[in-house]
Amino acid sequence: MIIEEAQAINSFFRSESSKEVYGLIWLLVPILTLVLGITIGVLVIVWLERKISAGIQRRIGPEYAGPLGILQALADGVKLLFKEDLLPSRGDIRLFSVGPSIAVVSILLSYSVIPFGHHLVLTDLSIGVSLWIAISSIAPIGLLMSGYGSNNKYSFSGGLRAAAQSISYEIPLTPCVLSISLLSNSSSTVDIVEAQSKYGFWGWNLWRQPIGFIVFIISSLAECERLPFDLPEAEEELVAGYQTEYSGIKFGLFYVASYLNLLVSSLFVTILYLGGWNLSIPYIPITELFEKNQTSEVFGTTISLLITLAKAYLFLFIPISTRWTLPRMRMDQLLNLGWKSLLPIALGNLLLTTSSQLVSL
């Protein structure tokens, strides 16, 4: 009798432990899938930028590594992975080593609230866009740590510039996001997309918030440190800015963080202003178009994912083309644009949005 009870207890604990293991596996599956998708997305961005840049400069661009050179970015990443990781002899090794990781991880966390399609979001939080703004302000801390830990005047100046630039353009970005939240009556990224679904192309927040859209684009370009806002790593002034002392995989992490941030900004422009996963046809939401059975739902989810990515990658032509068409700004011009121009415009836009919402009540 006692042996049977002991066997029953052992089988119970085994079943419970197996359930925990399966639960952990199913918890990791969407996270790993998201990381894999993000990695592929970054490789596509690098290839697009090289091809578009080559077209602007009348060159061919990468063409040998894989079909049409699409594997060139992967080859560069593997090369950096096997390069020697040098450390500054008089620098703060802990800050020097942790800085790139903080920059990458903080940007990766932003993807958790991005709805890539219908039912394709890792966590649908009621404070989704607010969480993104809070998380995006962590990355400059990693850059400042990298600059300070390098014990190099160029690196430290680049880190200080990155922190100043991020603060200057994070503040105008926030009123633009608050204006969208007021129009949608929610800070959830999913609710914001669904609020734009009724009228198709004409229901996009782009038409209701044109001022906020322009301010958001400029601020997001500055957050990504893209030309003409690449002052933290200006080659002519600071060698390579906060990246000067880095080599190997740590050096590659900064480039990964830059392209991750660019993809995040493009996806948030798509979600906040361009209707997200919705079609451009009025009164035909994609959620109702493919809800007849399970197969239709899977097909609809795939279509919504493709629509979101198509909008995001089409928007990427703006930051890529500005890299080769606009000159770099001076530091005083950059700060004046953020504090004296964009911030008053963003606050005025928020005031107008609030007033219109109060009048419509």
Swiss-Prot record:
Main location as per UniProt: plastid
InterPro entries: NADH_UbQ_OxRdtase_su1/FPO (IPR001694), NADH_UbQ_OxRdtase_su1_CS (IPR018086)
Catalytic activity: a plastoquinone + NADH + (n+1) H(+)(in) = a plastoquinol + NAD(+) + n H(+)(out); a plastoquinone + NADPH + (n+1) H(+)(in) = a plastoquinol + NADP(+) + n H(+)(out)
One CC-aspect GO term: chloroplast thylakoid membrane
Cellular localization per UniProt: Plastid, Chloroplast thylakoid membrane
Function: NDH shuttles electrons from NAD(P)H:plastoquinone, via FMN and iron-sulfur (Fe-S) centers, to quinones in the photosynthetic chain and possibly in a chloroplast respiratory chain. The immediate electron acceptor for the enzyme in this species is believed to be plastoquinone. Couples the redox reaction to proton translocation, and thus conserves the redox energy in a proton gradient.
NCBIfam families, A to Z: PRK06076.1-2
Assembly and binders: NDH is composed of at least 16 different subunits, 5 of which are encoded in the nucleus.
Family membership noted in the UniProt record: Belongs to the complex I subunit 1 family.
Protein name, per record: NAD(P)H-quinone oxidoreductase subunit 1, chloroplastic
Source species: Nuphar advena
Lineage, opening ranks: Eukaryota, Viridiplantae, Streptophyta, Embryophyta, Tracheophyta
